[in-house]
């Protein structure tokens, strides 16, 4: 499809965010993004960063040749700082504003995180195990903050229920101590309960 686009055999390309990843299509002069703010609603502290990155990337697909380009964004939040900064391609302004938000909320780079994710075919058993392991981690408060446990945004996947909780600490050593304790305690979990520890998780979903 991309070859046809480059050869001018097609004029309109409809795709996912994959079309933003490094493709050089110099004849493209108009790019449209539907629901450009949708990802901002995801329960992940990196949602703003990823949305800004995507919008800047997709804007870079238009006007790469001799002709000028235009980008149209559909958004319900035109005054959101991510949308405003992306429209202006204001990387420094976005970083300044995002860092203020993260500092206020205590998210990286102003803290260290670890995600403990559990899944099990039996939801009741899973919930009990998630609470048990979270209680193990709470023995390390106040140095380590425990957020959750709660059902994951995608609460069931391939016949298995999913729960998770988050550990947050300013001291990486204290976080490591809590993780070691949780890891040891997880050895007592039911054989059908899977427990995964993710330090500095790339996503929280």
State where each predicted segment sits.
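Accessory helical-bundle/CTD segments and flexible terminal tails appended to RecA-like ATPase motors
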Residues: 1-13, 18-42, 48, 57-205
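Glycine-rich S-adenosyl-L-methionine
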Residues: 54
């Amino acid at each position: 499809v991309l070859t046809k686009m480059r050869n001018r055999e097609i004029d309109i390309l409809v795709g996912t965010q994959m079309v933003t990843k490094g493709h050089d299509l110099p004849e493209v002069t108009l790019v449209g993004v539907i629901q450009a703010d949708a990802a901002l609603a995801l329960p992940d502290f990196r949602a703003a960063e990823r949305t800004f990155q995507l919008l800047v990337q997709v804007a870079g697909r238009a006007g790469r040749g001799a002709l000028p380009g235009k980008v149209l964004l559909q958004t319900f939040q035109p005054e959101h700082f991510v949308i405003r900064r992306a429209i202006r391609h204001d990387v420094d302004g976005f970083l300044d504003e995002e860092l203020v938000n993260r500092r206020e909320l205590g998210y990286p780079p102003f803290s260290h995180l670890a995600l403990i994710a559990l899944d099990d075919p039996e939801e009741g058993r899973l919930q009990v195990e998630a609470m048990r392991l979270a209680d193990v981690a709470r023995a390390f408060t106040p140095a380590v903050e425990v957020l959750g446990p709660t059902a994951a945004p995608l609460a069931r996947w391939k016949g298995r229920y999913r729960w998770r909780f988050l550990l947050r600490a300013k001291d990486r050593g204290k976080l490591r101590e809590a993780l070691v304790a949780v890891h040891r305690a997880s050895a007592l979990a039911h054989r059908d309960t899977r427990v995964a520890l993710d330090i500095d998780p790339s996503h929280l979903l």
